[in-house]
Amino acid sequence: MGVSRSTLRTEEIEEIREVSIFSQREIKRLYKRFKRLDKEEKGSINVEDFNQIPELSMNPMLPRIISIFDVNRDGQVNFKQFVKSLSTFHPKADKADKIKILFKVYDINNDGFITRDEIETILTMMVGSNLTKEQISSIVEETLNEADVNGKGKLDYPDFYNSIGSSGCNAENMLSISFNPFE
């Protein structure tokens, strides 16, 4: 699906339905929206194109999120990757899938652990200058103290998953984006 076409073939729609939460109708409408974003008609979009989506443009984590779904690591996301990424953030998407993505957002170097520096980097991206470095460091320290049950000084996926589940945070809402694929 590298080159942009005006319509999707039925087998392409079915293939995408298998890896997403969207209906056939929603996929067709998402394709129209994708084509509007793909102004150069190259069959893929980049970070700047994603910024044209109002529901995503204000998210300071957007470049990090896109990098997770950019499986080719070329700065481009094709339609299937686009739908799969939006599916993950659908309000009805599986909580465990959302937490896996959130873990990947924090695990910047993709080593399977979230370090103190990675938590600090992500937190800084989220709050900008609204908190001082000292406040951010305090939050990072508290997070590690509560979530790092084995005292490794970093979080593995089970630590992270358990801390999200026990923190009372609602991962379903936190990782949901309400958007209208019918625009």
From Swiss-Prot:
Binding site for Ca(2+): 107, 109, 111, 118
InterPro entries: EF-hand-dom_pair, EF_Hand_1_Ca_BS, EF_hand_dom
Protein name, entry field: Calcineurin subunit B type 2
Pfam families the UniProt entry points to: EF-hand_7
Superkingdom, natural source: Eukaryota
Family indicated by similarity: Belongs to the calcineurin regulatory subunit family.
PANTHER family for the chain: PROTEIN PHOSPATASE 3 REGULATORY SUBUNIT B ALPHA ISOFORM TYPE 1 (PTHR45942)
Domain (EF-hand) ranges: 25-60, 64-92, 94-129, 135-170
UniProt keyword Aminoacyl-tRNA synthetase present: no
One GO cellular component, as annotated: calcineurin complex
Coiled-coil spans in chain: none
Lipidation (N-myristoyl glycine): 2
Protein keywords: Calcium, Lipoprotein, Metal-binding, Myristate, Repeat
Entry-linked CDD domains: EFh
GO biological process entries: calcineurin-mediated signaling
Subunit structure: Calcineurin is composed of a catalytic subunit (A) and a regulatory subunit (B).
Matches recorded under Gene3D superfamilies: EF-hand (1.10.238.10)
SMART domains linked to this entry: EFh (SM00054)
Function per UniProt: Regulatory subunit of calcineurin, a calcium-dependent, calmodulin stimulated protein phosphatase. Confers calcium sensitivity.
Gene Ontology MF terms: calcium ion binding; calcium-dependent protein serine/threonine phosphatase regulator activity; phosphatase binding
